[in-house]
């Protein structure tokens, strides 16, 4: 059970919450702050003060005063009218993440909701009732209005949820769990939907998958180095310390550890003086992607604990301030950066695939075919990898450089952060498949070189891989092999803290 405070949630805890289904509870001190802040909102309504989002309309209607008797109707109308998402739903892990992050931001005690609302969000998390939230429709400012409205709907007993492996109406799940839908009071509708939790939840899942994929890429690249009898000198510690990037030094160190007892690597001058960049520069390229991942993790952990709705309430109600914390620009930039970092891992992997299958670049059978000419072997797998990396180049176009005004030009600059976050996740799926193709080719190359000559670590990884796909002895439908390896990589390693050398043993 993980305790939410509004201030301390980490990526490592989100791994447990999203991928292992761990439950959550609220910090009592934080809940007390929620209750105290709520008293401020109720006094504002009782006194008839004009405060945006509490006693006024929204967006362009901010100058419309709402009568006390209409405050509840205002909240309900807001949720229904803003539930305008379209397209396929977010993965269930993302909608679960949205519930967690929305509760966590409310626990900062500046949003003005009742403790009841926070408790309802936590009930949904712990009972694994996850909103069906369409992926499209958010501009990323005022936050993720459309996606979060679909989240808010289910608290009211409306909309759909994922529940016990099925997609059902929210009331079906609520009834089975013995829960009553809530009725929103002043400000609560706006507090639920004005924030960055869709882009951030998707970003967290993307980061978790990207981190695992980056570690896996090092193991797979190490197998390729063996298959191509790569020169180990390029990974010497002195080379990488001379440049000074910690991430580069770390990648080189891990690859040295992975290959320390390999009989397939060579020394410079034995077979050739130096390798092509896709082998020799693995620490420099993979290390740069790790720099991206470290940046993204830092920004996500800030946003996971951020108050991103509007207005915010401070100093016991002395200050009720309309600001712009809902603007998703920091996450939009981070997700665009993540897209580039992961696309590059796929790019260099595809070049290693080419070196494994091209007979002009190695002494292996052409396209790793058991009968070159009669059987095509891995020829079209390289085509597939090339297609995926080219698609990634399109998806990697920065969403954050775009903006389009909305709400009668009141909201005249937006982040497109949710588009960036969604595209980052797509790129990661593509990158994993490219790496799966590289792994299939590297395993085949290892067989030609002699499995007994592999390092202890890569040999273990090879045998695990062969449990997923057999050796290429005849042409077959390789699409199934690629998907099997990709699924195995995702499900067997994505919940680990990291893929270290011992994880493969």
UniProtKB/Swiss-Prot annotation:
Top-level taxon of origin: Bacteria
Cross-link for 5-imidazolinone (Ala-Gly), residue positions: 141-143
A GO CC term attached to the entry: cytoplasm
Pathway(s) served: Amino-acid degradation; L-histidine degradation into L-glutamate; N-formimidoyl-L-glutamate from L-histidine: step 1/3
Key words of the record: Cytoplasm, Histidine metabolism, Lyase
EC number: 4.3.1.3
GO BP annotations listed: L-histidine catabolic process to glutamate and formamide; L-histidine catabolic process to glutamate and formate
Modification(s) after translation: Contains an active site 4-methylidene-imidazol-5-one (MIO), which is formed autocatalytically by cyclization and dehydration of residues Ala-Ser-Gly.
GO MF term (any one): histidine ammonia-lyase activity
Residues recorded with modification 2,3-didehydroalanine (Ser): 142
Keyword Lyase: yes
Cell compartment(s), UniProt: Cytoplasm
Organism: Bacillus cereus (strain G9842)
HAMAP family: His_ammonia_lyase
First-level EC class: lyase
Catalytic activity field: L-histidine = trans-urocanate + NH4(+)
Family label: Belongs to the PAL/histidase family.
Record protein name field: Histidine ammonia-lyase
